[in-house]
Amino acid sequence: MMKQYIYLTLTLVLGLTLASCSKDQLCERSVLPPVSEQQSELDRWCQEHITRPYQAEVIYRWDRNHAERSTHTYPPRLEQVRPVLEALEATVLNLYRDKQFFISSDFIPAHPLLRIYLYGGANRDGQGVDLLFNRKAPSIELYIYNVDTFSPTNPVEVYRLVRSAQHQIGRHLMTIHPYDHDRFLSLGPDRYSSTTEPFADAYRSYEKSGRLREGLGLNRYAYSRGFYSILGMLGAREDLAEMYSVTLTETPAAITRAEQDAAIPDDADGDEEAKRRYAEEAKIAHETFVQKRAFLSKYIEEAWRIPLQRLQLQSLQLMNQYLDKHHATQP
């Protein structure tokens, strides 16, 4: 008798639940956001142009589980997703499908990126520093920020996109083909910081003064300390990936100028003690820069079996072709 009573009760509850659901307009009131026709078309484009050829899932819808808690990221505007991915393919992804460089099965797409995440805004940490990459993410994931401000006619935005992507792909390939971490770390271990706090003011000063491109790449603050970029100061892993990324977005002449300028001491304004200290710091910075440059070149050629300068020139050519196509004034 008790079993019959429980059965009847469950049947009644289920019937009421179904009746209630039948009255709801699920297509309009679902807790999940509806997929619009625009999104569906965009999904098809992403599948055809990115996922199939590169085996990487494109994720542009908001997922709070993949946003760093200390940042202020948000989802991109839909109309910006395709232009950014088109630029990414033209300036970065195509490089890794070029058979004259990557004929080995060890490279992309044999070891593809798993996912590409897109965010509308910057990836600012607690110090207000706009990071080009997600430090906590696995190397098989690519994070693209500042999607909403991207414009194919803005060379600085194109540069930032390429710098970010090349850093992350470089780190991915360095995971596949390990380098001598201890040897690289020995070239300048006392210069690294686990947070952006020591250099946050310097980094933001470039952005605030309208010199974003300089702040992201080669600048005196960085190379006078033996680095290719300010963000390279975050650690050896970030440093080598930054060196790779900067190399692929700067000319050989620009890197040589930075190397030479690193040897020039800061002005001591007549202070003899400061003059001696600055001279010693410049000597160390120059030596460190030279040693790091040689390390990266040797590692790429031996582990990847590709001359770094050939990759550099091809990367610059792809960037210039994209900028020329969109009639942008090249930086």
What is each PLM-predicted segment?
Residues 1-9:
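Bacterial N-terminal signal peptides that target proteins for export
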Residues 16-20:
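C-terminal motif of bacterial Sec signal peptides marking the signal peptidase cleavage site
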Residues 22-106, 291-331:
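Acidic/polar, low-complexity intrinsically disordered N-terminal segments immediately downstream
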Residues 26, 82-142:
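Auxiliary, metal-adjacent structural segments of Zn-dependent hydrolase domains
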Residues 70-78, 147-156, 160, 226-234:
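Second-shell loop/turn segments in exported
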Residues 95-119, 176-185, 254-264, 307-315:
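Surface-exposed patches in mature extracellular/periplasmic domains of secreted proteins
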Residues 155-184, 190, 241:
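Active-site recognition of the HExxH zinc-binding catalytic motif
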Residues 193-265, 269-304, 308, 317-331:
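Metalloprotease/metallohydrolase-associated module, dominated by Zn2+-dependent proteases
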